[in-house]
């Protein structure tokens, strides 16, 4: 059974009536003292910081002066803020789309905060001057406002209208909030037969109301000449069309609980979105589905993306700095010289950005830019040196999945570079200084990505399962030279490349001292670290190696209890919840091998020792192995934890939880040494 469902239907051509009509249980604009009491529900508790009482959206279509239809989107929201942790809800952000001279318009913005003071409801309205606009990129503007007089137990209401001619991109609707429960979430869309949409519904909660009604509307549309100009004001045409009005409601929707090992709530949260599939002029149905071929053509013409790839002169100004950067004549070494010049000298200021916001010359001058700007600059530099290269667009794990079947550019937040040198392809990211040539950060391994190139455009896939991480830990413990001072030992941890990258990044923030202090704290008082270091820390193309020397005190006692896994044991089960609705998404498959060779402490013998064990998970998808043996003088232990894949559906959760629970218990077992008599 799958963990969520995606429904695909053309929504303007069918009717599905499931529930009878039920009115929205909120009277907007009229707040009484009774409204300050939260209605009875099943999704709030003492930890709830705010409750979305009602969130209503509607989209209707209208004729426009561009020869077709646009839409009107209305939203009304009421929220009860319970404590200061939810004050962020008082700031509302609205994204508007713009393309050339055509832009969406925001109107009828109203926002009011209601407080109960001495038994009286006091309303404080937002002033229009408190509405601000920020440009996100060339196609998106963010309008933002903050409601005044917000404090604990305030009720806020806001509403607004968006007018848009971009009928190909009608608003999606999210029924579930990541942080706050919602008592009533409703979306209504009235779609004429002039346009048809594919909609996809995701999430695990069912609709409380799922209703569709046939109707009929007239649309007054201004004629447009072949040149694209509107005709005379009185040259209008009235088009009659059948409609389908859809109403979707979810009731008592819990906040989305973000569990361990889940890439992005966006992939699983309750929502519905739309893609234009066709238009109908009364005689002929015209498929309008966008394609990656068309999207690639547009992006290669876009001066804010990859137009430099098709311009004859390109960015010739790059030849001068390249002459100073590139010294080798070998193409691979040239590519590395360019790559490391960027990683070592440029600062990435945004890791969710695919467009050039200013110019590549500004990026070079200021030595900083977004991930898109830096990797587009890398692509351009490689092309200037006659190295085959192209940008690759993708969606990072935290941004959610994107579709291989059709392009939704808003879901793409990241750009890397594909370079082909000899018979080998390299995927590069020059925005991260601790990342080596030919490697990508873990969050890029999120499935589908698209190469943007006129000659070699294609879908590529970066899957978590393709990352093969091997970690080995070697521990050697011997008696001190005099046989009386205790034990001394060495610990060598050789993580895989991704773990090495993550360690390098954490050391940049906290430093090596903090790292080794944490190792010392985890080891306890009986073990003292005497020396420590990290090999290959400055070599981003290879994994690191952590080396530690230590002494262990053997107290004047008849019994020693020894935990044979010094570091790296699993202290707690990462899957503590008894029930899980969503899949488990590990960053990559794991294969960890811990090996201990230990002399029996002088004057002691082994009294008790853990038993050997081997446990398999899901018919070979993973296994845990605990092998231990002893002689009179020596103990040898080998512990292996292996997971061959990174993704597990919800139906595997219980067995996964039991598997890791067993590992935690087994790795906590001790060896007992008894003094010789």
Feature-to-residue mapping (PLM):
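Beta-strand-rich, non-transmembrane domain signature
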Residues: 21-290, 294, 373-379, 383, ...
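Secondary-structure boundary elements
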Residues: 291-366
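Short coil/turn segments at secondary-structure boundaries
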Residues: 89-93, 171-172, 201-203, 308-320, ...
């Amino acid at each position: 059974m799958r963990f969520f469902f995606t429904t695909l239907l053309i929504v303007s051509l069918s009717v599905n009536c499931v529930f009878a009509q039920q009115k929205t249980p909120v009277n907007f604009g009229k707040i009484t003292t009774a409204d300050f009491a939260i209605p009875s529900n099943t999704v709030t508790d003492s930890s709830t910081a705010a409750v979305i009482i009602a969130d209503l959206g509607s989209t209707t279509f209208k004729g426009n002066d561009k020869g077709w239809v646009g839409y009107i989107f209305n939203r009304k929201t009421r929220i009860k803020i319970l404590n200061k942790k939810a004050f962020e809800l008082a700031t509302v952000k609205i994204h508007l789309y713009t393309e050339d001279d055509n832009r969406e318009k925001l109107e009828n913005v109203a926002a009011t905060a209601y407080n109960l003071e001495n038994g009286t409801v006091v309303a404080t309205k937002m002033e229009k001057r408190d509405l601000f606009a920020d440009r996100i990129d060339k196609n998106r503007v963010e309008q933002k406002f903050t409601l005044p007089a917000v404090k604990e137990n305030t009720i806020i209401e806001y509403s607004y209208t968006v007018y848009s001619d971009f009928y190909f991109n009608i608003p999606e609707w999210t029924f579930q909030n990541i942080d706050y429960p919602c008592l009533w979430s409703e979306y209504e869309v009235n779609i004429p037969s002039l346009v048809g949409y594919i909609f996809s519904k995701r999430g695990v909660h069912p609709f409380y109301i799922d209703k569709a009604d046939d109707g009929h509307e007239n649309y007054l549309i201004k004629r447009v000449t072949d040149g694209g100009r509107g005709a005379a004001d009185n040259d209008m045409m009235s088009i009659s069309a059948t409609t389908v009005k859809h109403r979707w409601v979810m009731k008592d929707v819990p906040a989305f609980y973000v569990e361990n090992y889940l890439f992005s709530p966006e992939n699983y949260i309750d929502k519905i979105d739309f893609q234009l599939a066709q238009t109908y002029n009364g005689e002929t149905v015209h498929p309008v589905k966008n394609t990656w071929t068309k999207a690639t053509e547009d992006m290669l013409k876009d001066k804010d993306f990859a137009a430099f790839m098709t311009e004859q002169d390109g960015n010739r100004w790059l030849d001068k700095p390249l002459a100073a950067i590139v010294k080798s004549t070998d193409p691979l070494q040239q590519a590395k010289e360019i790559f490391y010049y960027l990683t070592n000298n440029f600062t990435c200021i945004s890791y969710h950005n695919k467009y050039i916001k200013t110019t590549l010359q500004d990026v070079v001058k200021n030595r900083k830019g977004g991930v898109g700007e830096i990797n587009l600059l890398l692509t351009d530099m490689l092309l200037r040196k006659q190295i085959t290269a192209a940008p690759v667009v993708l969606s990072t794990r935290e941004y959610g999945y994107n579709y291989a079947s059709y392009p939704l550019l808003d879901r793409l937040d990241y750009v890397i570079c594909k370079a082909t040198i000899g018979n080998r392809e390299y995927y590069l990211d020059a925005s991260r200084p601790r990342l080596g040539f030919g490697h990508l950060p873990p969050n890029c391994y999120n499935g589908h990505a698209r190469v943007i190139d006129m000659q070699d455009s294609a879908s590529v896939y970066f899957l978590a399962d393709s990352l093969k991480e091997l970690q080995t830990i070697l521990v050697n413990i011997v008696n001190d030279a005099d046989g009386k001072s205790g034990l001394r030992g060495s610990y060598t941890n050789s993580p895989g490349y991704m773990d090495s990258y993550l360690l390098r990044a954490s050391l940049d923030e906290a430093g090596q001292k903090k790292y080794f202090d944490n190792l010392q704290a985890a080891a306890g008082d009986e073990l003292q670290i005497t020396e420590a270091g990290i090999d290959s820390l400055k070599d981003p193309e290879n994994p690191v190696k952590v080396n530690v020397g230590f002494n262990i005190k053997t107290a004047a006692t008849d019994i020693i209890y020894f935990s044979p896994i010094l570091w790296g044991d699993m202290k707690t089960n990462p899957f503590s919840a008894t029930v899980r609705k969503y899949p488990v998404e590990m960053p990559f498959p794991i294969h960890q091998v811990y090996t201990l060779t230990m002399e029996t402490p002088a004057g002691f013998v082994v009294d008790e020792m853990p038993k050997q064990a081997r446990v398999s998970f899901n018919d070979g998808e993973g296994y845990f192995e605990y092998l231990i043996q002893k002689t009179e003088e020596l103990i040898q232990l080998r512990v292996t934890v292996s997971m061959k894949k990174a993704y597990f559906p919800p139906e595997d959760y219980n067995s996964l939880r039991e598997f890791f629970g067993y590992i935690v218990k087994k790795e906590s077992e001790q060896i007992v040494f008894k003094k010789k008599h």
